[in-house]
Amino acid sequence: MGSDDQSAADKIQKGFQINYMILRDADSGKIIWQENKDFSAPDVEHEARVPVKILDMRAVSREINFSTVESMENFRLDQKVLFKGRIMEEWFFEMGFVGASTTNTWQSTIEAAPESQMMPAKVLNGNVTIQTSFYDNETLITKSVVRLYYI
């Protein structure tokens, strides 16, 4: 990454903030979990306490509300689900252009793995991290790590 790319990434990162995150049952629309917290801080391992019933859902809708000072040409994210540090799943999401000085809501649906591939909550509890890397094109803006606890 050249110094121009790095300075652009620094400007975007300084003006980028997650305002809240919501997880819903994708079938009913009912809120399962909500947190009004900035999960975008890169040097912190965040924690989320999520109801165990989320593991029984066919699909989960994730809503991220974020604000940005700088515009982004192609906002996207790479999300990895890790169990004890090993990648179990990886998803790629692309939002596209994001205007400067805006607040945006991005909703995406994540379908559950087949039941035969699911592990019990007691095994997953505290051992799962979600690593989300936010990009503008190929420029990394920030990386968020959230450790999951099932309640």
UniProtKB/Swiss-Prot annotation:
InterPro entries: Ig_E-set, PDED_dom, PDED_dom_sf, Rhodop-sen_GMP-Pdiesterase_dsu. One of its GO terms (biological process) is sensory perception of light stimulus. One of its GO terms (cellular component) is cytoplasm. Gene3D superfamilies: GMP phosphodiesterase, delta subunit. It is found in: Nucleus; Cytoplasm. Its main location: nucleus. The keyword Oxidoreductase does not apply. Keywords: cGMP, Cytoplasm, Nucleus. The keyword Transmembrane helix does not apply. Interacts with Pde6. Belongs to the PDE6D/unc-119 family. PANTHER family: RETINAL ROD RHODOPSIN-SENSITIVE CGMP 3',5'-CYCLIC PHOSPHODIESTERASE DELTA-SUBUNIT (PTHR12976), RETINAL ROD RHODOPSIN-SENSITIVE CGMP 3',5'-CYCLIC PHOSPHODIESTERASE SUBUNIT DELTA (PTHR12976:SF0). This is Probable cGMP 3',5'-cyclic phosphodiesterase subunit delta. The gene is PrBP.
